[in-house]
Every structure is written in C-alpha cells, then in structure tokens.
C-alpha cells in the first residue's frame, strides 16, 4: 500500500493506540491525537505527529486537519476513536459523567467529521472510520446512555453513507463486542465476568480488521463491520 496520511483520535491507548501502531508499520504518515498526550511512538516515529488536544474544544478539529496538511501535505483517512464508557441505570448513573461521555462520543465526533468532510469533498476523496460498538445496534440493562451515544454515531454514519454513495469518500462503522482495554479498569466487576466471556477481543484484533477494510478496492463499500468474541451473546 502506498504511503497514506491519517488522523487518529483517541490514539494514546486501547483501540486507537493499536490502530496507530498498525498504520505506522504499514508506512502511514500519522497525526495522532490523545487528550493526555501519552501517545507512545513505536516504529517509523518520524512519520508521526502528536497533538495533545481536548476534542471538546471547537478548535481541535481544525488543529488536527491543519497539522496533517501543513506537515504531510494532505489527509486521506480520519479515524474517529476517542471515547469513554459510563454505565448504570438511567436512575442511578452519574449524570455529569454521562453528559461528558455524550459530548466526547457524540458532539466531538460530529464536529471532527463535519470539519474533515469539507476537506474530503474539496479533494474528492477520503475515508472516515468510526469506532462504534455492538451497543450501537442494540442495548442492554445499565447501558442505555453508552448505547445511545453509539446509536447516534451509527445514525450519522448511515446518513453519510447515503449522502456520499456516488463519491470517492467512504465511511465505515466498526462495531466491536467486548474489547480488553483500560476503559473498564475502574469497574467493580469486569464486563467479561458479567457476560461470562473467557477470551475477550484485544485492540490488535480491531486494528487487523481496520487494515483489512481499508485495503479493499475503492469500489467495495463496507458501511458496517461487527466483530465479536466467542461467547458474546448480546
């Protein structure tokens, strides 16, 4: 694959970090955004630019796009990956943390896609890959808020798919089941225990799927890609 240019949000850990590492090994030039700035550089670090940015700020989307253009001359891919998980019943969930999750998962995703889409329309090509969830297609007890955020991303992606169907701009929603990341580190009981899943997915599984998707010929469209671990019933 020829050298391409990508912007990745949520690149400091989990799925975003795995995608960063996989793209770097495949000769991508990358602008990596992590809120903490703790983006670990591996292979081909000279082709990675780090932006420590808060995606809740209106200026961050423009900053990321401008960084890609000014440093690498273009942008081919946008990976929308930043997010967090807040769970609990509608009655008992921490409402402030829930609202922050909604802003990060929904508002910031819409905002950055809005910004990059205008550039992709101008250049006539581009690919947007959104990390959603299996809980963007269904819900379960104590997951209404998180599922609702992912439903919003799925709706955005489906509308974009139709609006862009006759263009060379593509969009894919990745819908993972349970992935072993730090997002569950503060949970009193890990979801793999609650769901009785022995072998969860790992971030590298998602990165492998991403490479498979973006390696397809451009006339092949993959709007959704659900990936689940064995034993994931919901």
Regions found by a protein language model. Name each.
Residues 12-13:
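Conserved glycine-rich cofactor-binding loop
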Residues 26-41:
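Conserved glycine-rich Rossmann-like NAD(P)H-binding loop of the short-chain dehydrogenase/reductase
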Residues 89-90, 97-102:
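Substrate-binding pocket helix/loop in short-chain dehydrogenase/reductase
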Residues 113, 149-152:
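Active-site helix of classical SDR
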Residues 118, 162-165:
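Alpha-helical segment proximal to the catalytic Tyr-Lys
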Residues 133:
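Residue(s) in the substrate-gating loop at a strand-loop-helix junction
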Residues 173-174, 194-231:
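C-terminal helical subdomain
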């Amino acid at each position: 694959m020829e050298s391409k240019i990508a912007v990745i949000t949520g690149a400091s850990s989990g799925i975003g970090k795995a995608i960063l590492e996989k793209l770097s090994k495949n000769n991508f030039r990358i602008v990596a955004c992590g809120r903490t700035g703790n983006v670990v550089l591996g292979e081909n670090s000279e082709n990675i630019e780090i932006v420590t940015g808060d995606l809740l700020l209106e200026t961050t989307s423009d900053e990321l796009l401008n960084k890609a253009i000014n440093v690498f001359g273009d942008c081919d891919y946008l990976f929308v990956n930043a997010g967090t998980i807040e769970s609990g019943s509608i009655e008992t969930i921490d409402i402030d943390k829930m609202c922050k999750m909604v802003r990060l998962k929904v508002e910031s995703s819409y905002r950055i896609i809005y910004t990059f889409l205008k550039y992709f329309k101008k250049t006539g090509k581009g690919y947007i890959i959104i990390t959603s969830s299996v809980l963007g297609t269904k819900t379960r007890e104590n997951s209404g808020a998180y599922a609702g955020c992912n439903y919003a991303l799925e709706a955005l992606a489906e509308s974009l798919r139709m609006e862009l169907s006759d263009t060379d701009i593509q969009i894919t929603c990745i819908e993972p089941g349970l992935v072993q990341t730090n997002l569950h580190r503060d949970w009193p009981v890990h979801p793999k225990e609650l769901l009785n899943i022995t072998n969860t997915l790992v971030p590298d599984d998602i990165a492998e799927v991403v490479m498979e998707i973006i390696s397809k010929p451009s006339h092949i469209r993959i709007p959704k890609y659900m990936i689940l671990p064995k034993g994931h019933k919901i």
